A protein has these predicted regions:
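Extreme N-terminal "head/tail" segments of very large remodeling/mechanoenzyme assemblies
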Residues: 1-187
Length: 187
């Protein structure tokens, strides 16, 4: 029996009736870009991860920001009441919070009374933080952007947030900059 005969008579292990271009196409919405501004220790500039919808592996030393980025993406995807920070690192529930990421807490110092006090990169209320993720579906030829903007109202201590869902590609530099702390300018 020739190899041509084997090839012709052997049944494929998996048969997909779609054309090869459709069968190999990535299904669903895939993350294409992730941006952060003033999130954790990612401070004062826009930091971005471009992966074009490909799989991505975050690597780095302890304390390099891997869990901070994962928590940022999780913040965009999980309802606030169900959000648990730093699960990727197996940390205690109270170790990180929305406030710790907003202020950029990176260490603690003892005050005059001996109590530990968190030290952050950003002072209270004079900044805003932004998380933004773009997702694209090749099959639907559609892009969706999810974003959250965090800020403090004057005289308040609780971090406020604005949710954004837009059926197009947005970015922080173009769409979420230069409004100071005037969140009404965004709406």
């Amino acid at each position: 029996m020739s190899s041509d005969t084997l090839t012709e008579t052997a049944a494929p292990i998996h048969s997909d009736p779609r054309p090869v271009s459709q069968a190999t196409q990535r299904q669903g919405f895939r993350l294409t870009r992730f941006e952060v501004l003033n999130w954790g220790t990612f401070d004062r500039q826009i930091w971005h991860l471009d992966n074009s919808g490909d799989n991505c592996l975050l690597t780095g030393n302890i304390g390099s920001g891997k869990s901070t980025l994962v928590d940022g993406l999780t913040t965009l995807l999980v309802p606030p009441r169900k959000l648990a920070f730093n699960k990727a690192a197996g940390a205690e529930n109270k170790e990180r919070s929305l406030e710790s990421y907003f202020y950029g807490y990176y260490t603690s110092q003892q005050d005059e009374s001996g109590k530990a006090r968190a030290v952050g990169l950003r002072s209270k209320g004079n900044h805003y933080s932004v998380l933004l993720a773009q997702f694209h579906s090749v099959a639907l030829q559609q892009t969706i952007t999810l974003a959250q903007i965090f800020w403090l109202k004057p005289g308040e201590n609780k971090v406020k947030r604005l949710f954004v869902v837009v059926p197009e590609a947005l970015d922080i530099a173009t769409h979420f900059s230069d409004f100071g702390t005037q969140i009404k300018a965004l709406r």
